[in-house]
Amino acid sequence: MNSMLHIESNLLQIERSIEQIDIKGQYINLASPIYLSGQLNINELLAQYSNNIAQSDTSSVLQIGVDEAGRGPLLGSVNVASAILPRAWSGLIEGQPLKDTPLSILTDSKQLSEKKRDMLYPLVQQHAIGYVIADIPAAVIDQVNILQATMLGMRLCTEVMLEVIAYHLNDMAQDVHQLHAEVLFDGNRCPELNYARLVELGVEEKVDCQAWIKGDARHTSIAAASILAKVSRDKTMYALDAQHPEYGIAKHKGYPTRAHMEAIETYGVLAAHRRSFAPVRKALKR
């Protein structure tokens, strides 16, 4: 795993390239690197951590929302994001914790127009205490299947977030054992985290993983992650569209529309197509 951390002012910039992954004690060479990027606001982390401990005298609770975008398309990556909002902003959407904040319109990204998602994307990045975005390429999806690729992305976004938080709390002479992380995953299951890594970080007993069905429409932290995942994936689709305008990728975003299937039939299968998906397999056999 290639890791890069840049500190600009109080913002820690996160960049990771993962070529090999430990799954249940076995290292697997990935068919293509998984790229992660993100940011941690160190001052805001310390302020919230200290404030939470002062109020409870026991622990500091951070809520990490995690969501994905792009499981259904035939083309390109599946993107996953984790996000930590300020504690007062993190909660059930119906409770309106974002009222009168810059993120007041935030909800499930699928319920928002592309214009509103694009508007929220930099605002989430600006106001989040921390976030991580993972890009899991088609080659890895084909290697492990789309469900496992998504779970892997969720796991990595969570572990990288916890790692940089634990590292900087220790660096600032804070007791990391007082950290309690509630990790809220959109969907009906949680990924299996690398327990050995959590032990190394000293947080193995303080990570509470929760599966939230339709969580992106229920919890602000998951909705924030949903925006990051969706817009980051759209950006990769627009980049592919610029390289292959004849496929109309900007319109269908890789989903199996009639126009997309006709483009595959006319121009063939691209390197970024998911060969493990039935329509692409069928096209390759022609």
Swiss-Prot record:
Positions of disulphide bridges: none
Binding site for a divalent metal cation: 67-68, 186
Residue span, RNase H type-2 domain: 61-286
Reactions performed catalytically: Endonucleolytic cleavage to 5'-phosphomonoester
Entry GO CC: cytoplasm; ribonuclease H2 complex
Keyword terms, alphabetized: Cytoplasm, Endonuclease, Hydrolase, Manganese, Metal-binding, Nuclease
Protein name according to UniProt: Ribonuclease HII
Native organism: Psychrobacter cryohalolentis (strain ATCC BAA-1226 / DSM 17306 / VKM B-2378 / K5)
Gene: rnhB
